Amino acid sequence: CLKDENGHLFDRFRGRVIFPFFSVSGKVTGFAGRLIKQSDKAGKYVNSPTSILYEKKHELYGFYQAKQAIKREDCCYLVEGQLDVIQLVQSGIENVVASGGTALTYPQIRLIHRFTENVTILYDGDNAGIKAALRGLDMMLEEGVNVRVVLLPEGEDPDSFARKHDATEVLEYIKQHQTDFIRFKTK
């Protein structure tokens, strides 16, 4: 709970869709809440406060559900948001996790690296996504991860793209448009 200006308690997640975060062993550790209606007063996302169980920099949305597919496919698709994960999984792509925005962290990279050395960054094609992909590339290379980047068509994010295409089409697009870190950084 939080307090408003008048000292009244209210639920920090009110008016939001709630996404649970799970530990590697499947226990709920925290939540992210996304606004249902856009507001100038409130941030788009709110996370659980940092605790013994939950620290945002260590969390990857969907990791518990994706870890076996990541191991089986020997590849992890890294997206920005929870809705990106949900839509890609619904389209049939299971080896996908979200960093929870564009702020990828070393603990998140190390968690992925425990299950695969191969990561494909599939961030939004906007300026923020491109900048985040560049930062993420350097961090992953420092951690010894083989990293590739896919930029989606302008105006698309993984959620919207997967709504328009089935898994075969999404995977074909990734195959045709993925680029290694050298080519991506020199574009």
Which stretches of residues belong to each language-model region?
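C-terminal or mid-to-C-terminal helical accessory/interaction module adjacent to the motor/catalytic core
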Residues: G144-K187
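Phosphate-handling DNA/RNA-contact segment within nucleic-acid enzymes
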Residues: C1-F115, V119, A133
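Short, structured secondary-structure boundary patches
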Residues: F115-Y123, A167-Y173
